[in-house]
Amino acid sequence: MKIHNSDTAVVFIDPQNEVLSETGKPWPLLHESLKENNTIENMERIFKAAKSHDFEVFISPHYFFPVDKGWKFNGPLETEEFNNSLFARKGVLDLDGLIGSGADWLERFKPYIEDGKTVVVSPHRVWGPETNDLVLQLRKRGISKVILGGMLANMCVESHLRELVEQGFQVAVVKDATAAPKHPEWGYGYTAALINYAYIAHAVLTTDQAVEAMTSTLS
């Protein structure tokens, strides 16, 4: 997969406090994987490389609204999210209480996300981009290749990978710009994710490899 800023974009999933900050409710399950992968630092390196070399950046966020409590059924992790009010917002147009909450961006990422150039798409409602406008936004900008990272490795990142491939995009996953829960009953999600990345993605890169490819691209 050839990476070039004319047709390749960075897509980060859920760069939010809930899954990246010590204040996030799942921190006890995530902190080991985040530290082992150096996830936050690696995501920031990719942000910096993208901004310095004119790659478009897209954010696919995760939010839950009070009306979503009317859902009649949920999967295991969805149930945990609802029970613990993860990614909670007060309303679609209500920003009250957002700043500093689990749904807010990780503070160190805000300069990159809020620079007026990053495209924040509508929220994905479960795991994948089937329920938001990511694919539309990518196509409208002539993007056919994606550098993918963010959270969680085995859930939203993998779901975005699968759907983007189905939609005809080439996708490179940056394996150390993501992390996953170490769950006492369900297992280590990162191990499952790596196996599936190897089967599905057009490339599985380290952050070093991704940054090298981005910084050596010809404008």
Predicted segment positions?
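Short, well-ordered beta-to-alpha junction loops that form the rim of enzyme active sites
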Residues: 60-63, 151
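Short catalytic/ligand-binding loop motif for oxyanion handling, primarily in non-cytosolic enzymes
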Residues: 65-69
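N-terminal nucleotide-binding beta1-loop-alpha1 segment
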Residues: 13-15
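Active-site-adjacent betaalpha module
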Residues: 1-9, 18-19, 48, 52-53, ...
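A short alpha/beta connector and helix-capping loop motif
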Residues: 6-8, 23-50, 54-61
